[in-house]
Amino acid sequence: MIKNKVFLIGNAHLDPVWLWRRTEGYAEIKATFRSALDRMNEFEDYVFTASSASYYKWIEESEPEMFEEIKERVAQGRWVIAGGLWVQPDCNIPSGESFARHLLYSQRYYLEKFGKTANFGYNVDSFGHNGMLPQLLKHGGIGTYVFMRPDKVENPSLPTGLFNWQSPDGSRVLTYRLTTSYSDDYYSPERFPEYAGLS
């Protein structure tokens, strides 16, 4: 009998200025990051990941003690910085220069503050993905990418699951398109064995 090992990693997808005012979005980020740190104090094997360098910058500027806790957890490998972008942007309309600057500013920030850069792209809720993203991500030091939208109902022709995504210049990133929404009942405890391939 094959034993499967499943890793559950805490994550928070936040849209701090989509439907909230900036102050509300900031409050959600602060509360989420505080909760993640509290879980780490509670459970020694708890790991958390969050994207968007702008969130870390907000915490650094307004909650320096919390920021130092996050830096310590990143150094321990229990808090994983993700995304490599300043925020999760619209990935269809902006120019290549905009993406290049997203990557430059965020990766530079991560390196200065944490001594490392994000090594996987993370845009679960961005609508559409420019065909040049693999090239841009590669140049930004990112070799893997995770996304959800458009989901398989919105665009069933896109690959689902794990695949290699290639830009016209030949740059490739190992890509994972989430097979279900990050917020539906598929992730309920009752359905977890099915989702994880254990049933």
Model-derived regions: residue spans:
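Catalytic-domain carbohydrate-binding cleft regions of carbohydrate-active enzymes
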Residues: M1-S199
